[in-house]
């Protein structure tokens, strides 16, 4: 395992990753998994690709009922070839507003479950698949080698 600390940087030097949701996101359940894919290569200052385009990304979101948005601040995991990269990140929309704005489309979900989400969180928030967003990385970055399925 390899771990690095990314020092606090000025706004223009913060590492930002353009992403797209791989499936719809909603607050039907308390735990809100966000599955995404990196839209473009993330290149470090030395010119090396740190995270390739197409890398799978997993994070956790939560509902902000007042704003009608899905927010996420915390751990995100990137899966790139044989590495698992864990980072602290904040989710921003394309206009650099924190979180993803929800829509009214419910994807024919059980209306009782939607009512439960409204009762629990104060709102039902749905974000469609293929929604573009930005992850702003900060703090610690941990890189872990994943074992091969073909090695003993």
Model regions and ranges:
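Extended amphipathic ligand-handling, pore-lining, and cofactor/metal-binding catalytic surfaces
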Residues: 66-129
């Amino acid at each position: 395992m390899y771990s690095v600390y990314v020092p606090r940087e000025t706004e223009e030097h913060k590492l930002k990753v353009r992403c797209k949701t791989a499936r719809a996101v909603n607050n039907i359940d308390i735990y809100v998994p966000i599955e995404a894919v990196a839209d473009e290569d993330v290149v470090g200052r030395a010119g090396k690709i740190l995270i390739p385009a197409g890398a799978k990304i997993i994070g956790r979101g939560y509902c902000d009922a007042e704003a009608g948005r899905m927010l996420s601040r915390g751990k995100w995991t990137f899966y790139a070839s044989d590495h698992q990269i864990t980072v602290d990140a904040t989710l921003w929309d394309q206009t650099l507003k924190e979180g993803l704005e929800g829509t009214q489309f419910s994807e024919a979900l059980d209306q009782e479950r939607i009512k439960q989400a409204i009762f629990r969180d104060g709102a039902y928030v749905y974000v469609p698949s293929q929604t573009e967003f930005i992850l702003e990385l900060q703090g610690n970055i941990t890189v872990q080698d994943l074992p091969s399925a073909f090695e003993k």
